[in-house]
Amino acid sequence: MRSRNQGGESSSNGHVSCPKSSIISSDGGKGPSEDAKKNKANRKEEDVMASGTIKRHLKPSGESEKKTKKSVELSKEDLIQLLSIMEGELQAREDVIHMLRTEKTKPEVLEAHYGSAEPEKVLRVLHRDAILAQEKSIGEDVYEKPISELDRLEEKQKETYRRMLEQLLLAEKCHRRTVYELENEKHKHTDYMNKSDDFTNLLEQERERLKKLLEQEKAYQARKEKENAKRLNKLRDELVKLKSFALMLVDERQMHIEQLGLQSQKVQDLTQKLREEEEKLKAVTYKSKEDRQKLLKLEVDFEHKASRFSQEHEEMNAKLANQESHNRQLRLKLVGLSQRIEELEETNKSLQKAEEELQELREKIAKGECGNSSLMAEVESLRKRVLEMEGKDEEITKTEAQCRELKKKLQEEEHHSKELRLEVEKLQKRMSELEKLEEAFSRSKSECTQLHLNLEKEKNLTKDLLNELEVVKSRVKELECSESRLEKAELSLKDDLTKLKSFTVMLVDERKNMMEKIKQEERKVDGLNKNFKVEQGKVMDVTEKLIEESKKLLKLKSEMEEKEYSLTKERDELMGKLRSEEERSCELSCSVDLLKKRLDGIEEVEREINRGRSCKGSEFTCPEDNKIRELTLEIERLKKRLQQLEVVEGDLMKTEDEYDQLEQKFRTEQDKANFLSQQLEEIKHQMAKHKAIEKGEAVSQEAELRHRFRLEEAKSRDLQAEVQALKEKIHELMNKEDQLSQLQVDYSVLQQRFMEEETKNKNMGREVLNLTKELELSKRYSRALRPSGNGRRMVDVPVASTGVQTEAVCGDAAEEETPAVFIRKSFQEENHIMSNLRQVGLKKPMERSSVLDRYPPAANELTMRKSWIPWMRKRENGPSTPQEKGPRPNQGAGHPGELVLAPKQGQPLHIRVTPDHENSTATLEITSPTSEEFFSSTTVIPTLGNQKPRITIIPSPNVMSQKPKSADPTLGPERAMSPVTITTISREKSPEGGRSAFADRPASPIQIMTVSTSAAPTEIAVSPESQEVPMGRTILKVTPEKQTVPAPVRKYNSNANIITTEDNKIHIHLGSQFKRSPGPAAEGVSPVITVRPVNVTAEKEVSTGTVLRSPRNHLSSRPGASKVTSTITITPVTTSSTRGTQSVSGQDGSSQRPTPTRIPMSKGMKAGKPVVAASGAGNLTKFQPRAETQSMKIELKKSAASSTASLGGGKG
């Protein structure tokens, strides 16, 4: 009942304090918290419940009331309520402070923070809330970021404005420049058109002469066809022989294949048997291993389980006994507790009755029925009983809980005991099973022993089978080797057959050369092998000698070491005795000094210790209160003492070091004194000897000493000689070791060289195969060119490539000796040129040159390299960048591609020439039957003075000497020429040297035609040897009348001057006002028209000057002269692909159709170009505009002209 009384008191106190709290809350202006309200409600309920008797009981005593007022003890709830009220007041005060602060805030601050200052109150409230929430963005200004962004925008605007102004200025400049250039180009265009008319007149006159040349060429071709027919017959006979040989080889191969098949079947049968045996063995071994593992596992498991079950059985028995005793005790407790519970239930019933009576009494008191003091006494007594009963109730509840827990424990123990019994039964069953397993284990052991014996037998069998397998494998390897050999033989035979079918006599010669080279290489390899074996034998001999010498040296070393050791021992013993005696004396003196110093130090230490002890004795006599202070003082003194001792130790260390130094000095002084004393003794001894000698007493002793001295000197000399000899031997051995190491290095180097030679031989073989393949490819291309049965040649080998000459051509170069090497190089050069041209095409066009550069004076025109046509360049959307690859004779720059004339297949073209002598022009109209393919060409030819244009042809000699770097040559015969001089230059290959298989055949010459329009100096003359003309090219050049000496031939001038414009006219532009890029040009070079093929290597937007490589470097003429005539025939030709090459054999000189090259076509080359392509022999010129499906060719055929003079092409 104590808890209830306390609650009643607290409620009464709370009732008194309630009005105060309400007043405080009204003064503070803020109500209490929700917790305080809840507490109030609880208190009111308790006040209502409290009885009036208690209040009456408290009223009469006035003194007690005064005491309670003095010492008011507030409860926890009241204190919490007061605290909450105080917190509310503080919050209200803080709110008021914030309100006042926000009222003082200026509108400028609000505007900076929120961007506007119109609703001031609302913004202030927001500002206040932000301060309360402690936001981070209170001090931030809204206008900072936009202002900074505005500044950035202004700066960017200024920069963009400046850039735009610059671009506009640049655009204006470019516009002015383009306008100026366009005007200049218009003037030039008119000039070019006037000049092209004159050229057409020249072409008409040239046509008649070319017809005569064609007739001569036909006669030459007939002669050639007869020769080709004879050679074809010979080749067919050889083919028949080779076919018979191939059939024999095929029969042999079939025999070998049958033998191989039989042997392979045998091998397969044996391998199958072996596999079966191996599989059986593997299965048996696997089973035996598994059985062993199982047995071992079972043994281990059985042992573990037996031990574990025995331990578990013992533990379970012990647990059962403990559980049974524990259960008995719990049952006894249960019985006692059940009795107690019954008693408590009875008391509980009585208590419930008392409570009911109490409630009735309380009701009566509340109603005011009973107001007697006796009833009050009864109530008090009843209350006491109720309190006692409540205490008993608590005890009863505790006992009930204990009983429940005990019941639960009992149930758990019973359940656990049941489980233990079940486990014991399981263990017993398991024991019986394990006994059975033991029996099975013993049986399996016996089976294992039997299996082991079987395994050993099987192993023996497998060993025998393996031996048989190895024998079979060796046989199989031998068979495989024979197979591979046969396959190699087969492949080689196939290759030979294809080669013999496709290759001509030239390839046979090449193969012979290659075989000779291979034999030479094999001989070299054999020689190297022999040298290697000889070197190996020498190395072995040297190693044996070195080993013997090293053994001897070791013996000598050991003997010398023993001698030296004995001598040094004797000397060391004598020296040691002397030193030991001296050291003893020094040590004794030092030890005496040290002992003295140590004694002094020990005495000082003892004195200090005695002093410390006396101080300590006096301190112990002090009273107890001052002991702590004295101890601290002692500690401080001891610390100081320790420091002093450390300093003393340092001093002692220093003194020791000084002592050691003094000791060393003393020893040195003592040594000096001993040495001096010895010298004194020797001097005394000598003085005594001298005196004795003077007296004649000690002569015999001096003689003996001298004799001994001489003997010792002789011994020392012998020893020195021996030492020297040993040193020399050691040096020799070292040298030999170095030689050995060098020999090993040389041996390794030789091995490497040998390996390299082997690899080289392999590479040579591969190269031979590659070359044969390349020649096959070239033959395939030539097969596409040759007609089948019209009497012409069967095989046309292209001997002139279209590659750029990138290095000087050496006359005696080994690589140029064979046509295979030449063909390979030509393909490489083609690829190289195309890659260069692609790079140039990708480059940006360079800026135009100034007016002075474009229009140089007439004096400088002779040194210009290329003609420049700006209006044409503009049509092709960009100028070509002049390439200068160095000061070479074949240097030139390129020009964009021109349009291609593409007549329909099988339809002839008609050329109509209309000359105009008044305007010095001629119009060339090239038409096909339909109106779509109509083209016209207007040629303007300038006449110097009042001379009329005419065409003259100079027959030139056909002997050419090809030099890589020649000066600008001139034509041999000097004569007065017409305004336009067309010069045909003929040459053929020299039959000398025996390099070609067709050297005995007459070869068609190569003709070069030069056309130039400007005057050249008459002083230019160069020897025939210094002239260079590329094989397989025709060069067109126009020269005026005043040129007394023929102008030098310029190869592949940069810009082709035959252009087709939008009005379907071909304009061939000539003249001296063409712009040329400044380059390395020789004196006397006149402006040149160069017409070159589209589909050869210079197949891009840049046409580079090219020098062609030919299989033979030297060219000589054939005796015999004939007339030179030439005609132009234009016929449409269908091409097999979009690109084509014109390649004709230098030996045969027959015409051939264009064939596709391996050079890829760039997109910029889709526009066609007029093409002049000389064949390999140089007797065929084709004007071939390229189209997608067909091409038109203008063939310029010339006959051979023989003369002994040589003529070369000039630098282009």
From Swiss-Prot:
Residues 191-575, 623-777 form a coiled coil. Residues 1-15, 1139-1155 have a biased composition (Polar residues). InterPro entries: Cortactin-Actin_Reg, Cortactin-binding_p2_N. PANTHER family: FILAMIN-A-INTERACTING PROTEIN 1, FILAMIN/GPBP-INTERACTING PROTEIN. By acting through a filamin-A/F-actin axis, it controls the start of neocortical cell migration from the ventricular zone. May be able to induce the degradation of Filamin A. One of its GO terms (cellular component) is actin cytoskeleton. It comes from Rattus norvegicus (Rat). Expressed in muscle tissue, including heart. Found in cortical ventricular zone. Residues 32-47, 60-73 have a biased composition (Basic and acidic residues). Gene3D superfamilies: 1.20.5.4090. Belongs to the FILIP1 family. Residues 1-73, 871-898, 948-975, 1102-1190 are annotated as: Disordered. GO terms for biological process: cerebral cortex development; corpus callosum development; modification of postsynaptic structure; neuron migration; protein localization to actin cytoskeleton. The modification Phosphoserine is found at S137, S978. It is found in: Cytoplasm, Cytoskeleton. This is Filamin-A-interacting protein 1. Keywords: Coiled coil, Cytoplasm, Cytoskeleton, Phosphoprotein. It comes from the Eukaryota. Residues 1124-1138 have a biased composition (Low complexity).
